[in-house]
């Protein structure tokens, strides 16, 4: 299984990442990545860009160094009804939207409250995937979350960075992978790179996918064409709203 798409990356705009879009694209090209999503943190994160940054992403070329660039965000879940820190008028302009919990944006509560919030987020028509759902600070009912992803046509992310920065994530990620395989839910894999040298790095995720024997057809990162088709359908759906 070869990955050619990276769905989770951060540029210097996130405030705690260290590379420009141009540097990220150049490194992606060198690493054999054909498409990546810029998913800088939403404005509730300390040091993250304001909304105008996301409104102006259109100035970034669609292709740099032969690599396709998706304009996106990692939106923060900011309440337990599933509210995000990005208003609809901005979300609807983006190609790819991740949503996630961060403890500096929302205080962890109970498994039931976390699960309800994520299920509500998955109902948001602009959200494409739940990022790093294996985070042990925010335990989830894995079966219910995966079922909600299936019902809403959304993705579950496996995050390569989680194995290092979110200690205790590995077993949760493995359970998410197993449940996605069981329910036939598609996954996206993100490097969560905060510097250009990590774009397209999936070593830990590769190992996990091998362990659970994940079918290739459930992994979106193997084909630019799969992503193009998904984004085309998403934009058509949003236009009809």
UniProtKB/Swiss-Prot annotation:
Q: Which Pfam families match?
A: PHP
The UniProt note on the cofactor reads as follows: Binds 3 Zn(2+) ions per subunit.
Residues annotated as binding Zn(2+) 2: 16, 41, 194
Enzyme kind, highest EC tier: hydrolase
Q: What is its EC number?
A: 3.1.3.-
UniProtKB keywords: Hydrolase, Metal-binding, Zinc
Could you tell me which InterPro entries the record lists for this protein? Phosphatase_YcdX_put (IPR023710), PHP_dom (IPR004013), PHP_phosphatase (IPR050243), Pol/His_phosphatase_N (IPR003141), Pol/histidinol_Pase-like (IPR016195)
Give the CC-aspect GO terms. cytosol
Q: Which residues bind Zn(2+) 3?
A: 74, 102, 132
What cofactor is needed? Zn(2+)
> Which GO molecular function annotation, any one, does this entry have?
zinc ion binding
- Gene3D superfamilies the record matches: Metal-dependent hydrolases
Residues involved in Zn(2+) 1 binding? 8, 10, 74, 192
Query: Does the record's keyword annotation contain Zinc?
Result: yes
Q: Which family does it belong to?
A: Belongs to the PHP family.
Provide the protein name.
Answer: Probable phosphatase Cthe_0111
User: What species does this protein belong to?
Assistant: Acetivibrio thermocellus (strain ATCC 27405 / DSM 1237 / JCM 9322 / NBRC 103400 / NCIMB 10682 / NRRL B-4536 / VPI 7372)
